[in-house]
Amino acid sequence: MSAPLKRTPLAEEHLAAGARMVDFGGWDMPLAYGSQLEEHHAVRQDAGMFDVSHMLNVDVGGADATAFLRRLVANDVARLATPGKALYSCMLNPQGGIIDDLIIYYFAPDQWRVVVNAGTADKDIAWMQRVAAADGFDVAIAPRRDLAMVAVQGPNARAKVWAARPAWQAASEPLAPFSAAAVEAGTLVARTGYTGEDGFEIVLPADAVVQLWRDLLAQGVRPCGLGARDTLRLEAGMNLYGQDMDELVHPDQAGLSWTVALKDEARRFVGRDAIEQFAVPRAFVGLKLQERGVMRAHMPVRCAQGMGELTSGTMSPTLGVSVGFARVPVGVQPGDAVEVEIRGKWVPALVCKLPFVRHGKAVEHS
């Protein structure tokens, strides 16, 4: 018998709003509250909010916290010197495969926070503890299931958060992208997101999230589900763990080589040896379909250099055409013509540099 689905502190709010709920990584999460298309456009044109409380915040502290994270992840946290600053990274296995992608926040040399994906949270914690024990790091790893998280995204997102919580504006208005600030005790506001739009991700005590959700709703922020979250992140050129990459995929094969810091040769992060010895046999590209149809994951892609495969695909609400990501042979370049097999028919597609949409506007590809 399968385990019951986990629920976030906002579960009753979703049900009361008529959300269609689905199993997402073992969590009962809203797919949509009505029109997925309208939710998508709300984020691109105004403001939408997502319950992301299924994601796990993990506090990492102790005398060796910085050294531990420099060993644990492929990006180099040593570049973070300003409290509240964050970076995106992959956590790799010894073979160079991606255990998870995550965001790491710096507060002090002995005080960090790591945000991991919901479906990999237990695996991630076990791996972090294993690395800490293997190398004898003096570090405390504390999962924070007492916290909830809401992402408010869109061109008007920040203004509507401030309308709902005026006291937060002074601390959060100066934030640069990929930075966070404590706006009150136990509450962190970060200028981050997963949509390609401006906005905040707000981490706060679980017992305070329902009132925040209701207050944002009163300011006209539209609740959005996983369906819109997926089309938004695809347009923005952002990977989804478990779909675009996993433990068998190296960062280079998922368009994430920019998250691997190799400059400091003395920093032997987990997976570095495999990364340095591995010749990348696949490239990761965006595709835009040139005729009618919808690309989906696992569809074959025919290129002049050989065969590839879609990892993600959807109909783009902003562009009105199907877009997707594909792993293809090395040598495939933006501007190349390829074909995607859809229902037994080979349909032409254009290879594009990501993203497809930036700040609500289509990115020109030729």
Swiss-Prot record:
Q: Which reaction does it catalyse?
A: N(6)-[(R)-S(8)-aminomethyldihydrolipoyl]-L-lysyl-[protein] + (6S)-5,6,7,8-tetrahydrofolate = N(6)-[(R)-dihydrolipoyl]-L-lysyl-[protein] + (6R)-5,10-methylene-5,6,7,8-tetrahydrofolate + NH4(+)
GO biological process terms held by the UniProt record: glycine decarboxylation via glycine cleavage system
Q: Which UniProt keywords apply?
A: Aminotransferase, Transferase
Q: What is its EC number?
A: 2.1.2.10
**Residues in coiled coil:** none
Record carries keyword Protein biosynthesis: no
Q: Which GO terms describe its cellular component?
A: cytosol; glycine cleavage complex
Write down the InterPro entries for this protein, in alphabetical order.
Answer: GCS_T (IPR006223), GCS_T_bac (IPR022903), GCST_C (IPR013977), GCV_T_N (IPR006222), GcvT/YgfZ/DmdA (IPR028896), GcvT/YgfZ_C (IPR029043), TrmE/GcvT_dom1 (IPR027266)
| One Pfam family from the record | GCV_T_C
Q: Could you give a GO molecular-function term held by this entry?
A: aminomethyltransferase activity
Can you tell which superkingdom this protein's organism belongs to? Bacteria
Binding partners and assembly: The glycine cleavage system is composed of four proteins: P, T, L and H.
The record ties this protein, via PANTHER family, to:
AMINOMETHYLTRANSFERASE, AMINOMETHYLTRANSFERASE, MITOCHONDRIAL
This chain's function reads: The glycine cleavage system catalyzes the degradation of glycine.
For this chain, the family text in UniProt reads: Belongs to the GcvT family.
HAMAP family the UniProt entry points to: GcvT (MF_00259)
Q: What protein name applies here?
A: Aminomethyltransferase
Q: Which organism is it from?
A: Bordetella bronchiseptica (strain ATCC BAA-588 / NCTC 13252 / RB50) (Alcaligenes bronchisepticus)
GN (gene name): gcvT
